[in-house]
Amino acid sequence: MFRNVKELIEITKEKQILISDVMIAQEMEVTEKTKEDIFQQMDHNLSVMEAAVQKGLEGVTSQTGLTGGDAVKLQAYIRSGKSLSGPLILDAVSKAVATNEVNAAMGTICATPTAGSAGVVPGTLFAVKEKLNPTREQMIRFLFTAGAFGFVVANNASISGAAGGCQAEVGSASGMAAAAIVEMAGGTPEQSAEAMAITLKNMLGLVCDPVAGLVEVPCVKRNAMGASNAMIAADMALAGITSRIPCDEVIDAMYKIGQTMPTALRETGQGGLAATPTGRELEKKIFGGALGSRETTSAN
């Protein structure tokens, strides 16, 4: 079993296998299930993600009315041919938004690694699918690779907004996606680690400040940024660009930053955007009562 990214990469070198292979082997060891059973479960997760993306692209709106319809707008904008950032990145962004809009509308999603950050991995996966035309097995392996890096973060830092801010949720998801994109594109395990490091460095310090304590504002749009961040970081790593700070040290830095982050900025809905005049008005409109007094339990 690997405990950090360094050990993960060492295993791939020693055995001449992919990161996804290492994660699959670990799952087999821990769960005592066959490879076929593990693939079947991950295939189910993939199907859930695919359905969520499709539903979101058809258009959904949350019960509060705070979020919904933006994925549809983005797809229309892509078709217009006017996009500045290019169709592939915007496709990833729109599919990330689609997933989180479904989550906000009480639909079914697959937490990657949390519900609040569930759009980044499927958003990038189904966008890259259009360019690389992967097999179903390669798409499933994408999820195992992402999971390997998520496993390291969860065991050495945090994937919880309440513990580490949004950097721990969307930041982790973005890094996981970047690493998986690299493997799917034919990059090396070392490049996957570089992609994770580059991605996460750019999310450090991101707070968790959900308006009204709901996983809507700014969570949905942060998934959009997480998806675009992952795509850019993956390209940088594939181009041979490296992080001066090793991946494990970046993860440790994220953990320490989260430990020093004020409680008001860790999912409580007491600070940041949640505490703005508009944020408080939206909270009052949705829930009524004294502003800022409601105990929040939703993840960012």
Curated annotation (Swiss-Prot):
Gene Ontology terms for molecular function: 4 iron, 4 sulfur cluster binding; L-serine ammonia-lyase activity; metal ion binding
Enzyme class: lyase
Entry keyword Electron transport: no
The record's free-text note on cofactor binding: Binds 1 [4Fe-4S] cluster.
Essential cofactor(s): [4Fe-4S] cluster
NCBIfam families found in the cross-reference section: sda_alpha (TIGR00718)
Subunit relationships: Heterodimer of an alpha chain and a beta chain.
Protein family per UniProt: Belongs to the iron-sulfur dependent L-serine dehydratase family.
Protein's name according to its UniProt entry: Probable L-serine dehydratase, alpha chain
Gene of this entry: sdaAA
